[in-house]
């Protein structure tokens, strides 16, 4: 897998092995997501604080860092996947103040207000397909109630094709 744009364009990153670990977002979808985000922030991510709530391979969050995001906080519940995300980011970004990887459950952490790095301007939501919209809505509500979302925050929710048209009620 490669970074598609920004400072680290073309650089390789590793992805977790095993069928049940993650399902990395394809290059085409990552490019579309990055284009939407860049457009939403007038092509300037310099002050954008990013939360990658379900890290997986880490590719979406790393893509935002590559394109200039101020900071990235990535949550990943699987220890091995979290280690790999850390390794990938370390190979690209030496400025440790710009990123952190948290091994843990973002839903539980958000409900207790324990999500470092906020308030967030951009929340990347690419949960396991089995999640559906309900836990994502709960996560966003908790982030908002805990003061972890910046005014006008942008959330990008990737979901199964079968769920097309559905979205958390709190999305505009």
Predicted regions mapped to residue ranges:
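Class I S-adenosyl-L-methionine-dependent methyltransferase catalytic core
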Residues: 1-172
């Amino acid at each position: 897998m490669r970074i598609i744009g920004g400072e680290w364009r073309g650089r390789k990153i590793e992805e977790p092995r095993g069928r049940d670990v993650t399902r990395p977002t394809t290059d085409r979808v990552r490019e579309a997501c990055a284009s939407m985000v860049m457009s939403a922030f007038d092509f300037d991510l310099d002050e954008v604080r990013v939360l990658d709530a379900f890290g997986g391979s880490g590719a979406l969050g790393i893509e935002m860092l590559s394109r200039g995001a101020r900071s990235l906080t990535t949550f990943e519940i699987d220890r091995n996947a979290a280690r790999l995300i850390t390794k990938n980011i370390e190979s690209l970004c030496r400025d440790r103040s710009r990123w952190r990887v948290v091994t843990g459950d973002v839903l539980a952490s958000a409900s207790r207000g324990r999500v470092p790095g906020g308030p967030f301007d951009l929340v990347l939501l690419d949960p396991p397909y089995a999640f559906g919209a309900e836990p994502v809505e709960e996560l966003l509500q908790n982030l908002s109630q805990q003061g972890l979302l910046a005014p006008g925050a942008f959330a990008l929710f990737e979901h199964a094709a079968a769920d097309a048209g559905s979205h958390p009620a709190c999305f505009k």
